[in-house]
Amino acid sequence: MAGQRAPHLHLAELSASQFLDVWRHFDADGNGYIEGKELENFFQELESARKGTGVDSKRDSLGDKMKEFMHKYDKNADGKIEMAELAQILPTEENFLLCFRQHVGSSSEFMEAWRRYDTDRSGYIEANELKGFLSDLLKKANRPYDEAKLQEYTQTILRMFDMNGDGKLGLSEMSRLLPVQENFLLKFQGMKLSSEEFNAIFAFYDKDGSGFIDEHELDALLKDLYEKNKKEMSIQQLTNYRRSIMNLSDGGKLYRKELEVVLCSEPPL
């Protein structure tokens, strides 16, 4: 090991909690990625750990090996390593993060799962709801678990993604479990509406005051939102965003509360 920089990076199997410790050590600024100097530090530590296991790490220059490494693991080629990409590199116990993402691999599936587990329509998944989510995930993946392990996974996910420490996960926090290319909610960052702005735009499209809009009205609303923010959106993107958001709807009726969860600045990131 190189000094005391990352005591858990020893390439033995990591528990979920140990994996989180490694992640937080290298994601020093807490932005959800390892990039730049963080990535360089991680790679140097990884090479040092590999030397300790007898893996030859002298064959190429550090720069060459970093390029090869990023080509293999940086799946969306953005020059950053995100949490699930790191889970593929480190021998994480049962690789629970990848297991999670396989369960909600697309934004549409994610929104379906959100609606199913946000049972009280609060706009949050609380610890007990998250526990049910993870239990179903593990059953679907045929992964054996006991109550203690389920509790550890629940608490670890909360520690990873509960950015404001309130013991519950908002939609924007929970969506960080999605691969970046599937996380359509990231597309709305910088376009979040205040409650007043949201109420005004919803009222404009809910012309009959029914309290809900349909998919055609949602189409128009999303186009309007993008145009006002001078952002471009393809027909395919619009279709995907609409489909994902409509998974929150009740029989094709998208109520104010469901859309507010997606478009408003709260819950805070």
From Swiss-Prot:
SUPFAM superfamilies: EF-hand. GO terms for biological process: intracellular calcium ion homeostasis; regulation of synaptic plasticity; synaptic signaling. PROSITE patterns: EF_HAND_1, EF_HAND_2. It is found in: Synapse; Cell projection, Dendrite. Ca(2+) 2 binds at D74, N76, D78, K80, E85. Ca(2+) 5 binds at D206, D208, S210, E217. Ca(2+) 1 binds at D27, D29, N31, Y33, E38. Pfam families: EF-hand_1, EF-hand_7. Keywords: Calcium, Cell projection, Metal-binding, Repeat, Synapse. One of its GO terms (molecular function) is calcium ion binding involved in regulation of presynaptic cytosolic calcium ion concentration. GO terms for cellular component: dendriole; parallel fiber to Purkinje cell synapse. Ca(2+) 3 binds at D118, D120, S122, Y124, E129. The keyword Flavoprotein does not apply. Ca(2+) 4 binds at D162, N164, D166, K168, E173. Belongs to the calbindin family. Calcium-binding protein involved in calcium homeostasis and signal transduction. It plays a critical role in buffering intracellular calcium levels and modulating calcium-dependent signaling pathways. Predominantly expressed in specific neuronal populations, influences synaptic plasticity and neuronal excitability, contributing to learning and memory. During embryonic development, it facilitates neuronal differentiation and maturation. This is Calretinin.
